[in-house]
Amino acid sequence: MKTAKTVDEQIDILRSRGIIINDPEKAKEILNDIGYYRLGFYFFPFEKTHPQTTNRTHEVIPGTQFEDAVALYYFDFDLRNILNRYLTRVEVAFRTYLTYYMSLQYKTDPLWFVSSTVVIQSFINDFDRIVYQSEAFRKNQQIKRHHNKYPADKYAPAWKTVEFMTFGSIVRLYKSIDNKDDKKAIARNFGVGKSAVFATYIDAIYTLRNKCAHGLALFDLQLPNGIIAAKGPKIGLTGADCQNLNGAITVLLYVLKHISQNRANDLQRELDELYTRFKKQRVELVEILKKCSGLNF
């Protein structure tokens, strides 16, 4: 097992890999700020063996500078700050419409989210463990207040319970709805005719949102499930774009447009400004970034 290294030792390791460090003191300041391990993700595309993830030597292509990885890091940082606001908008709208539509469809059953006639059994089986008995739910004041007022209720009604579920649980709830017409109706509200296609859209948005929420690298994002593009709306995704950052942002823009065209316009404008600024400041890194992310500069 590797042992912890001082910042000076970290500098030595980076230099041994061929990374040019013109200002060691500034590099130390950055390593203390960002962290050696975190910054390592941004050196990866400069490695000779990239995109290979096994048997890596960590040696970089000649001419790679410390500032190159830092520039990618701050591009990611700025992109994350832009995306967070719009991802939240989509999450709230998705949660709201799913709750609204399903609660009206099953008016006589305020606990439709655990009803075997509405959702598949595996979701119901896991609901207590994953959702209702989670620490967040046990400490939630609104949920506690409901049960204090109605002690006989096993669960709070959908409009309370679903409001406090995690985005991941909401996505799983959508996929667990048994009636295909219900799923299709929710998908259509966001401009997608097929529920299977929409499930991949919302999966991509969820993955992107999680990366942003946890401060993880975005530029080389890979979607675990991919996006179904061929049978969905014409959004211009083919090949690798169905699994990369460009694909995730494309479906985010598409879904956001069906929530608010103005907000979609705002997001596109902010992205264009970020891309233009990056091109002006670090034009030599544009091709590397495009190769990793699929973004269209």
Task: Identify the residue ranges that each predicted region occupies.
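Extended intrinsically disordered or low-complexity regions, especially N/C-terminal cytosolic tails and loops
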Residues: 1-208, 219-297
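Acidic/aromatic/glycine-rich contiguous surface patches that form carbohydrate-binding/processing clefts
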Residues: 215
